[in-house]
């Protein structure tokens, strides 16, 4: 195990979608149980004592990560971002982006996360799934258009459109690219599979990227006995390690090795997981 570690917090299994390929067993029939903010605070605090110092880039995922807004908990994500920033981390929020079609919800979410980014002087990133599995192009276009045409949002939010290494994902990304061009956004194709989309004369932008360097394996919903359906490397560079802490009091290393936390210190949990690797 090398010395690069990324932290990820899975805040819920609830999702408004039920995608056939979902590796997290997420759907709208799951109980909307959220990782408590008290536990998030505890994990972030203890992360500073881990034997491997985590990268400052962390992620929040689900289910649908913005689900708290749909269950009358509009302060959840802003407080989670406050905690992440206060411990010196830079957050990425993974989402399916379908909330972009709800005008009131879209404006609320974008303003909330932008206000936190401005407060701490660091960007917040949205990772939005754009592939053959998510019918979300309309909502995604509205999120992008709002972000890049609003000064406060443009300088606070970075958006990554994330796809798989499949022809369907390539088609979805190309379709998004063409629609963005019709909206008047400049696109600089810097290297194969990745585009950076910038509002004219603005320094902030959007990255369209293929998130996985390898093809998808074992497409299909995860089995109850299998934590994760592998889709390639974990977050970060090749060989990096990802420690995910979820809403069911489990720690998962590299989407493979699973360990109950059971009120143990996080450094002890990571030690147990590292023993499983070896």
Stretches found by the model and what they are:
Residues 1, 85, 120, 153, ...:
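Solvent-exposed loop and beta-edge segments used for protein-protein assembly and interaction
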Residues 1-21, 55-60, 241-249:
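N-terminal pre-triad scaffold of radical SAM enzymes
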Residues 190-278:
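Accessory C-terminal segments flanking Radical SAM cores
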